[in-house]
UniProtKB/Swiss-Prot annotation:
<dbReference type="Pfam" id="PF00046">
    <property type="entry name" value="Homeodomain"/>
</dbReference>
<feature type="DNA-binding region" description="Homeobox">
    <location>
        <begin position="559"/>
        <end position="618"/>
    </location>
</feature>
<dbReference type="InterPro" id="IPR001965">
    <property type="entry name" value="Znf_PHD"/>
</dbReference>
<feature type="compositionally biased region" description="Acidic residues">
    <location>
        <begin position="306"/>
        <end position="319"/>
    </location>
</feature>
<feature type="compositionally biased region" description="Low complexity">
    <location>
        <begin position="84"/>
        <end position="93"/>
    </location>
</feature>
<feature type="compositionally biased region" description="Acidic residues">
    <location>
        <begin position="334"/>
        <end position="360"/>
    </location>
</feature>
<comment type="similarity">
    <text>Belongs to the PHD-associated homeobox family.</text>
</comment>
<keyword id="KW-0479">Metal-binding</keyword>
<keyword id="KW-0862">Zinc</keyword>
<dbReference type="GO" id="GO:0008270">
    <property type="term" value="F:zinc ion binding"/>
</dbReference>
<keyword id="KW-0805">Transcription regulation</keyword>
<feature type="compositionally biased region" description="Basic and acidic residues">
    <location>
        <begin position="409"/>
        <end position="422"/>
    </location>
</feature>
<feature type="compositionally biased region" description="Basic and acidic residues">
    <location>
        <begin position="324"/>
        <end position="333"/>
    </location>
</feature>
<feature type="region of interest" description="Disordered">
    <location>
        <begin position="76"/>
        <end position="120"/>
    </location>
</feature>
<feature type="compositionally biased region" description="Basic and acidic residues">
    <location>
        <begin position="361"/>
        <end position="373"/>
    </location>
</feature>
<feature type="region of interest" description="Disordered">
    <location>
        <begin position="662"/>
        <end position="719"/>
    </location>
</feature>
<dbReference type="InterPro" id="IPR001356">
    <property type="entry name" value="HD"/>
</dbReference>
Amino acid sequence: MEKNIAHCPVEGNGEIENGASSSQNPESLEHSVLLSTSQTMPNNLGIRKNYKRAANRGKKGSQGLTGQAYTLMSSNSDVRVLRSTSSSKTTSTEHVQAPVQPAAKRRKMSRASNKSSTDEFSQIRKRVRYILNRMNYEQSLIEAYASEGWKNQSLDKIRPEKELERAKSEILRCKLRIREVFRNIDSLLSKGKIDETLFDSEGEISCEDIFCSTCGSNDATLGNDIILCDGACDRGFHQNCLNPPLRTEDIPMGDEGWLCPACDCKIDCIDLINELHGSNISIEDSWEKVFPDAAAMANDSKQDDAFDLPSDDSDDNDFDPNMPEEHVVGKDEESSEEDEDGGSDSDDSDFLTCSDDSEPLIDKKVDDLRLPSEDSEDDDYDPAGPDSDKDVEKKSSSDESDFTSDSDDFCKEISKSGHDEVSSPLLPDAKVGDMEKITAQAKTTSSADDPMETEIDQGVVLPDSRRRQAERLDYKKLYDEAYGEASSDSSDDEEWSGKNTPIIKSNEEGEANSPAGKGSRVVHHNDELTTQSTKKSLHSIHGSVDEKPGDLTSNGSNSTARKGHFGPVINQKLHEHFKTQPYPSRSVKESLAEELGLTFRQVNKWFETRRHSARVASSRKGISLDKHSPQNTNSQVTASMEPKEPEGTVVEESNVCLNGGTTISKEAVSSKVGSRTPGSDVGGSKVDSAEDQNPGPDLAEKARQKAIQQELRKKKMGR
C-alpha cells in the first residue's frame, strides 16, 4: 500500500492522457497529491519503528544498486516522453513546460554529486588494487631467485642482492600505504556515527535517536526515510542523501542487511587482501590489524636511526653546567695529547728533514693556544694562579724529550766527533779564502746555539723551551745508521759526497782533467795557509790521517766503516782489536760499545765491513801478484794510488809494502792540471814503456770507476 501511495504522482498519468483535464486543472492535481502524502505520514512512522538491525551483519545487500540506478533515469525519460505527447495534443504548452524545467535542473545536480561520490570510493578501490598488484610483482621477483629450481639449477644464478633488497623495501612501503588507505576509510566511517549506548541488548534503537549522518536531520518522509547501515559504522542515511539515492523498493526486506557506500568500499578492499595474501580480516576490524608486521618493522628501523643520535638529556654524568669553559678546553687538549702521542715519532722524523734554508718557526700566540688571557681587567684573572707560560714550556720540553730520546745515538756521535756536520764538506781544491769565510760563518751560526753546544759537549742533552733550529745533517750517515752501510770495493764509493762527483768527458784532455783520484792518502804540510777546517774536510774525504801506514791495503782503498766517522781514538782502538781478534764474540762487542760510547749495531757493522774490505784486498792482491812482476806492480800501484792535486801542494806518498821489503817513497810537486810526473800519471794516461806494454791496471781501473758510477746511481735511485 505504501509503494502505491509513493507512486501516486506517477499513476496520475491517466489523467494526463485526457489533455484538457490535465491542462485545465493542474492545481487540483497537485492538491490531491499533497492530501494523499499527508494522509500516509502516520503510517510511515509506524514502518520506521519496525526497522531492526539485521542479525547477519556484513552481508552486502546492495549488489544491484549500480544497475538499478538507471531505472530512475528511465522514469525521468518517461516523463520527458509524456511531456512531448501532451504538448502535441494541446495547442497551449505554457502549462506543461512550467513544472518540468525544475526537474531537469535537479537531474543535472544529482549527476554531479553522484560522480563525485562514486569517484571518491572508486579511487580508493583502484588505489588498493594497484598497490596489491605492485606487491605481487615484487614478491614474484623475490620468489624467482629464492626457489631452487629443477635439480637445484637455480642455485647457480647470480643473485641481484641490491635489487632483492629494493624489492623487499618496496613491499614494506606498499603495506604501509595500504594501512594508510584503511586508516582513511575508518576516518570516513567515524563521521556521523551513532553512539552505541543508544542501542539496546537486541540491537534496536528508538526512532527519536536516529539521525542522518549526511545532513544531521532526524526528519523522515514516506519517500525519504532514514535507513541504518548494517556494517561497522552504525550510521543512518536519508534515502535521498545517499549518492545515488536509494529507492524504497530497493531496500532489502527481512534479515538481509544493507551497507553504506563507505562500508561497501571497505569490504571490497578486505576481500582483495584476503584473496591475495590469505589473511582473515573482517569488516569490524580496525586499520591497525591490517599488516601489523609491516608497522613493527617500520618502528624498528626508526628506533635504530634514533639510537645513532646523541642524547640531549641534561642529566648526563659528564655534564657540569657550573664548569667554566677554560676547563672544558683543557680537557679537550689533554684528550688530544693522548691521541697525538702515537704520532710524535713520525712528527719528529719529519722535523729532522728540515733544511738550513728554512726560516725559524714563529711561536704561537696565546690566543692560538687557547690559553686564558693575563689581562688584569678580565674577570677570570687570578694573579696568584699558575703561570700558563710555564705550562707551555713544560709541554714543549716533554715534546723535545721525546725528540731527543729518538736521537740519543746521533747526539753521542756529535759529541765524539765535534761539530763537523755544521759545515758542508769542502773540496780539496777549494781556495783558502773561501774556506776561512765558511769557517767564520759556521762559528757565527754555532755561537747562536751556545746552550745546546755546551750540553752536547757534556754528553747530556737537556730539553729546551723553544723550538730547535735545524742544522745541516749528513743524510748519508743517517741512512747508513738506519739501513746499514752497503759494502763496496772502492773507497770512493764510501767517501762520496754530492760535490765531488766525477765529470766524464769524451776526449783525452777531459780524461786527464777528471777529478777521480786513484785512492792514495794526501797529507798537506809545510803550508802555513792551510787551516784546521781544510784538514777536517780532507780528513772526512780521504780518511784518517793518524792511521798507520801498514793498515793500507794493496789497492789503496779505505773500505772500513767510513774512516774518521767515530774519531781517530775510536778508530785506533777498533783497529787494535781487529788485529788481535777479527771475529770477536758478542760480549767483546758489547764491552767495546760500552767503552767507546757506541751502540752494539755500530761496532758489529764496523767489524763486518772491515773483514769484507780485508777479503777484497787480499783477493785483488793475489790477482795483481799473478799477472805482473814485482817491479811493474810497484810502479803501477803507485801510479794508481796518486790522485789529482791542486796547484802548489806538496804530495807525500805513504810507504806501501807489497813484496817483502820493496818500498817506494818520493816527493813530487804537482804542476798544472794535465801535466805528467815521473812514475805516475794524474789523469790516467800512460807514461812509461812498462805501462804501455802492460795496460791491465788501466783497464781494471776504468772498470772499477764504471762500477763505482753504477753503484752511485743505484743508491741515488734507492733514496
